[in-house]
């Protein structure tokens, strides 16, 4: 047999048998894709959480769990410490779980110094109504440094509603009533009062 034909035949066999192996994907990804991670931590709590080769301690108090339209929302007051250099941060963590066949979770950290701004932002967006514009629809939003986003908007038929979202790429969104938003605001005030005690 001709050596050129033999080489071509060998290359074809390699392509037929090795092609499917090369086309297979690697195992599951447990971390968010790199494009979803901010280059630098945006809150003090995230800065401590993202450290490696350190002992990080966390203390937390649970303040509320709300289930609204297939989303479970959890609010905790949190304290984190890095035992290596005595760095300490306190604040809130709000986690959203999307219930169902493929549950998803996302959470947002809110530093203590940002809580008052969050409360004012929640109060401001909750007061927004159709008088802010002469157009048919309206929307107001407030976003924290840790990517917790609160929206208040006009629904087509049923008046004003709110939403709470967490995350960068794979966002989890809870649809709320204005009463739900006010309850959450009350729980945040309670959690801040607890953090004031340990500040």
Where are these regions (language model features)?
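Bacterial N-terminal signal peptides
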Residues: 7-17
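Positively charged, low-complexity terminal tracts
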Residues: 22-199
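Positively charged n-region of N-terminal signal peptides that target proteins for export
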Residues: 1-6
């Amino acid at each position: 047999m001709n050596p050129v034909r033999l080489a071509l035949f060998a290359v074809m066999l390699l392509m037929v048998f090795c092609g499917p192996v090369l086309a297979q994907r690697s195992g599951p990804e447990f971390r968010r894709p790199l494009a979803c991670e901010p280059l630098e931590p945006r809150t003090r709590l995230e800065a401590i959480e993202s450290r490696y080769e350190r002992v990080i301690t966390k203390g937390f108090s649970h303040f509320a769990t709300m289930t609204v339209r297939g989303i479970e929302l959890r609010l905790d007051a949190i304290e984190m410490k890095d035992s290596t250099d005595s760095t300490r941060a306190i604040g809130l963590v709000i986690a959203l779980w999307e219930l169902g066949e493929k549950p998803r979770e996302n959470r947002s950290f809110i530093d203590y110094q940002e809580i008052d701004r969050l409360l004012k932002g929640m109060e401001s967006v909750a007061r927004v109504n159709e008088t802010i514009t002469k157009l048919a629809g309206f929307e107001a939003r407030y976003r924290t440094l840790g990517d917790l986003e609160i929206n208040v908007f006009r629904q087509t038929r049923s008046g004003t509603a709110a939403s709470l979202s967490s995350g960068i790429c794979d966002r989890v969104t809870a649809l709320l009533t204005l009463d739900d938003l006010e309850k959450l605001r009350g729980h945040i005030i309670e959690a801040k009062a607890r953090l004031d005690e340990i500040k």
